[in-house]
Amino acid sequence: MNPDLLWLVVLALAVFAGILSGVPVLLAIAGAPTLVALIAASAGQFDLGYFQAVPQRVFGVMTNPLLLAVPLFVLMGLLLEKSQQAEKMLKSLTAALGGNQSALALAVVLVSALIAASTGIIGATIVMLGTITLPALLKAGINKHMSSGLICASGTLGQIIPPSIVLILLGDQISNAYFEAQQEAGNFAPDPVTVGDLFAGALLPGLLLVALYTGYVFLNLRGKASETDETAESPKSSLSELLKNIAPTLGLIIAVLGSILIGVATPTEAAGVGVAGALVIAAAGQGARAFWVASACAALAVLLLILRQSGLFGLEFAGGKIAWTLPTLTAVGAVVVLGALLAAVVMALPHRDVLGSALSETVIITGMIFGIVIAASILSLVFRGFNGDEHVSELLQSLPGGAYGMLLLTMLVIFLLGFILEFVEIIFIVVPIVGPIILQTDISPVWFAVLIALNLQTSFLTPPFGFALFYFRSVAPDTIRTRDIYVSVLPFVGLQLFALALVAAVPALATWLPDVLFK
C-alpha cells in the first residue's frame, strides 16, 4: 500500500477514535492529527514544515470579516430567545389562527421558522421549543408522536432558513473552494460567491420545507377542533396581539435579510443592525426607559449604515497613517456614542440577566465555533501533508457518473458524518477537501452549498443518531420514550428527503433567486 494512503487511514482512525472517546471535539480534531503527524515525522513520512502555516491560518480566521458576523448573529438570536419572544408569538399566533389543535401545531411551525431564522442554532431552538411548546401541544390533545416530531423537525429549520450561521460558514468555505477550483481550471478572475448568494439560494428551499411541514400538519389535524386556552380572546384582541408580538421579530428578520439581498449591507453590517434591533425588542418588554434607550442605540446603528453607504463613515488612511478626515472623525465619534448608549442600555434594563445571559452564551458558542475552525485547519494541513487532496481527487474522478457521481458520494459522506459531528466540523473539514474538486465541474457553487445545508438538516433529524433527537430527549418527559421520538420524526425525515431530492432534481430552486438579484 502507498505509505501516504496508510497514514491517511491511520489519521482517519485516530480522529474518529478521539471523537468517540468522549474528549472535547476540539481536542480530538486538533490533537489526533498532530500526534499522527509527529509519529509519521519520526518515521520520515511527514514534513513538519506544514505546521509553520498554523499561525497564518489562525490569523486568517481571526481577521476574516465575514466570520465576524457569526457572534453577532448568535447574539441577535439569543437576545430574542432570552426575552421570551417565542412564547409570546406562539400564544398570539395560535389565538389568531383559531385556537384549535391544528392552529397550535401550525403556530409551532411558523414560530419555529421565525426563531430558527434568528438563532440558527439547532440545540438552542429545539430545547426552547420543547420547553415552551411541548406541554401546550400535549395539553391540546395532540398525540406525543406528532408533538415530538413537530418540535424536532421545526427546530432544524435554522439550518436552511437565512440568515443562518450554517450558511455563513458555508459561504466562507464555498467561496474559498470555488476560487481554488477556478484557478486550477485557468480562470484567475472568477465571479465571487458571497453569503448573500447563499442566503438567496436557500430562501426558496427553506420556505418549501415550511410549506411541506404545514401541509402535513394540516392534513393530519384537520377536523380536530378541541379548543386550547387561547380561544378565549376575541378576534380583534388576537389580531392586535399578533401584530404586537410578531411584527417586531418578523420586521427585524426582513430588515436584516433584505439589506443583504439587495446589497445595502454586508452580512457583518446587517448582523450589527440585527443585534441593535434585537436589543430594542428585548428592552421593549422591560420598561419604557430601557425601550427608549435601546431604540436610540438601534437608530444610531441604522444611521451608521446609511453613512457607510454614502461614504461619510469609515477610517481613511494616507501614507500608512490615519487621515483625520470627516469619515474618520464620524467613525471615531460614532464608536464613542454607541459605546455610551450600550452602557446606558445595560443600566436601564430592569432585568439585566437577559443581556448578561445572552452575552455569556454568545462568548461560549462563538469560542466553540472558532476553536473548531482553527482545529479543522490543523487537520486540513496534516491531511494535505499526506497528499490526501490528491488521493481524494483521484477517487472522485474515478467514480462513474462524472460530476454527479462525485456529488452523490459527497452527500452520502456528509449525511453519515452528520451522525457524529456538528455542522461546523463538517463544513470546515469536508468542504475544503472535496469542494475544489467538485466545483471544477459545471456544478453551481450555490446549488452545492444549499444541498449541503439540506443534507445536514436531514442528517441531524434522522434516527438513531440525529443530534436533534438527543437535544429533544434532554427536555422530553419520561412518558415520551426514545423509541417514540425515533418513530415521531420518520414522516418529517421523509419530507426532508423529498425536499432534498426536489432541489437536487431542479437546481433552479436554489439558483433562480441569486441570478435574479445579483446578475
Describe these PLM feature segments.
Residues 1-519:
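Alpha-helical transmembrane segments of multi-pass membrane transport proteins
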